[in-house]
């Protein structure tokens, strides 16, 4: 049996993280707690907070307040879940970076630009996989292999399905 939880940017859980320390913040929806923390240059920092707007969740450590080069979001849950998708919204920023489920191999983040003007890039990472209770999903704006362009984006949404034992 499975139940579904869906978050759509500031209308959902993202607004609950607004202004909270990126050292770690927790919100609850439909019986599942989600914990998000941010890192800058692979370090936890108390100087940044989460920000949200109509495009999604970002970090305040840079001027643009997105997830910029060298920044990452770490997401975990208090239950076993299937992460069906994560929406990445770059807007005027740049898609790029990687995601990683637990200790599995990292995979590149790619986006599309509907009208090729580089002003509305977005991507949907789908079929991400099972995330066991306490495991982390890392969404990182750093280049995947160190040679690609870094990302500058927001987490626009997350769709999960709870696994019932």
What are these regions (language model features)?
Residues 139-151:
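Short beta-strand-plus-loop segments that form exposed binding edges in beta-rich domains
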């Amino acid at each position: 049996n499975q139940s579904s939880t869906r978050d759509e940017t500031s209308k959902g859980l993202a607004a609950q993280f607004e202004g909270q320390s990126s050292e770690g913040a927790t919100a609850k929806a439909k019986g599942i707690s989600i914990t998000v923390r941010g890192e800058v240059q692979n370090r936890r920092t108390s100087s940044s907070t989460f920000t949200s707007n109509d495009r999604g969740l970002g970090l305040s450590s840079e001027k643009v307040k997105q997830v910029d080069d060298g920044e990452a979001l770490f997401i975990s849950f208090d239950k076993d879940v299937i992460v069906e998708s994560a929406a990445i919204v770059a807007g005027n920023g740049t898609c790029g970076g990687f995601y990683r489920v637990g200790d599995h191999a990292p995979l590149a983040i790619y986006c599309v630009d509907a009208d090729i003007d580089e002003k509305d890039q977005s991507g949907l990472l789908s079929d991400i996989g099972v995330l066991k209770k306490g495991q982390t999903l890392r969404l990182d704006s750093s280049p995947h292999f160190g040679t690609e362009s870094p990302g500058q984006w927001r987490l626009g949404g997350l769709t999960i399905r709870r696994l019932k034992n």
